[in-house]
From Swiss-Prot:
Pathway: Cofactor biosynthesis; thiamine diphosphate biosynthesis. This is Phosphomethylpyrimidine synthase. One of its GO terms (biological process) is thiamine biosynthetic process. InterPro entries: ThiC, ThiC/Bza_core_dom, ThiC/BzaA/B. Disulfide bonds: none annotated. [4Fe-4S] cluster binds at C408, C411, C415. Zn(2+) binds at H269, H333.
Length: 424
């Protein structure tokens, strides 16, 4: 049985118990949300996960970190280090998005070492193999679509991005759209290219039932990818984006009927004033399914600092109901991220998630804020560092300019906390 099927039958799995304990909620709440499809618990039957996560309504906002190789940069050891650092700094899941080297070796190695759920985009493998053999990114068969899904499932992947909403109808509209950037989703572009080359419908859409059978066999959580997501704020919230969303909304019901866990992926470039509308519309059309957003970025002019833009958009999106934030690194739109970029990206998105949790009244988040306030009141630096996401940076800065008495070198003897304590 899948986690959803177990939940519907009143069965409480070990993973449900673990996430309930982490969230600080009764396990019955976890079971109920999973049964309704308003939350997902990604866990392939073949992957042993030490730190499972629950994503969805009523639970803390989660953060995903993307790692993976690219042409000219395909070191397995570097990817393993990225994974280690991402997890150390609080990533709730990883996605392996490699496009060069031995893709299966890299994927299996990350799954084996990861204590958190691991996701992937199977269509990348089809495109990479096609390019390496034929120098053509979309020269592969319909069978390859599903063979790669099975291969990823067998390797223990817990959730998969499947760009099922890129249909012929949606694609016809994009050709005549006024978008500056027509398609920016790599998976969406690969599938669109294949459809145009072969004059065929998207196999993932046409044979969605077959995809559901595979997902059910392994208990893969399907993340319905937004291949038509806007790639710039000037293209946000257009007809192409929403038409694809309506297709995805229809397929949510099909997945639930099959007992397959499903979530929706959302836009990555959205002006701040449109974030609430996008999140609420996704929740409505997706019938309450969890929402997985890339960012979102509320400006396109933050190159080198896109992780900061991401944190701003992500905090607001999380407040309005987004459940799962995919991090963005300082290298976004520039280059393949290195280990330091991964660290910075995770911290930025974790800050966004925490800000959203506090604003949403999450009990655990508020308890930690109270602990930090008390630590500051008592000048308990070690507790302050331990509660901070960037504890190593905070400690380094404190030690670089030490102050011999209570307080720090910012205020010295003019510390407001000390003065208030002395004269109150």
């Amino acid at each position: 049985m899948t986690q959803m099927e177990m939940a519907r039958k009143g069965v409480v799995s070990d993973e449900m118990k673990k996430v309930a304990e982490y969230e600080g909620v009764d396990v019955e709440i976890v079971r109920q949300k999973l049964a309704e499809g308003r939350a997902v618990l990604p866990k392939n039957k073949l992957h042993r996960i030490e730190r499972p996560m629950i994503v969805g309504e009523g639970f803390s906002v989660k953060v995903n970190a993307n790692i993976g190789t690219s042409q000219g940069f395909s070191s397995l050891e570097e990817e393993k280090e990225k994974a280690r650092v991402a997890i150390e700094y609080g990533a709730d899941s990883l996605m392996v998005l490699s496009t060069w080297g031995d893709l299966r070796e890299i994927r299996r190695a990350i799954v084996e070492m990861s204590p958190v759920p691991v996701g992937s985009v199977p269509i990348y493998d089809s495109a990479v193999r096609s390019y390496q053999m034929k120098k053509n990114v979309v020269d592969f068969s319909e069978k390859d679509f599903f063979d790669m899904v099975i291969a990823h499932a067998e390797d223990g992947i817990d959730f998969m991005t499947i760009h099922v909403g890129v249909t012929r109808r949606v694609l016809d509209r994009i050709k005549s759209s006024r978008r500056v950037l027509k398609i920016v989703s790599r998976g969406g572009a690969i599938i669109a290219g294949w459809m145009i080359k072969n004059n065929r419908e998207n196999p993932f859409y046409e044979h969605f039932d077959e995809l559901l059978d595979i997902a059910k066999d392994y208990d893969i959580t399907l993340s319905l990818g937004d291949g038509m997501r806007p790639g710039a704020v000037v293209d946000a919230s257009d007809a192409q984006q929403f038409e694809e969303l309506f297709v995805m909304g229809e397929l949510v019901e099909k997945a639930r009927e099959k007992g397959v866990q499903v979530m929706l992926e959302g836009p990555g470039h959205v002006p701040l004033n449109e974030v609430e509308m996008n999140v609420r519309l996704m929740k409505k059309i997706g019938k309450g399914a969890p929402i997985f957003l890339l960012g979102p970025l509320p400006t396109d002019r933050a190159m080198g600092y896109d992780h900061i833009a991401c944190a701003i958009g992500g905090a607001l999106a999380g407040y309005y109901g987004a459940d799962f934030l995919c991090y963005v690194t300082p290298s976004e739109h520039i280059s393949l991220p290195d280990v330091e970029d991964v660290r910075e990206g995770v911290i930025a998105s974790k800050i966004a998630a925490i800000v959203a949790d506090v604003a949403r009244g999450n009990k655990k988040a508020w308890e930690l804020e109270k602990k930090m306030a008390l630590a500051r009141k008592n000048f308990d630096w070690e507790t302050m560092f331990s509660l901070s996401l960037g504890k190593d940076v905070a400690k380094k800065k404190y030690e670089e300019r030490p102050y011999p008495d209570k307080g720090c070198s910012m205020c010295g003897p003019f510390c407001a906390i000390k003065i208030a304590e002395e004269f109150s």
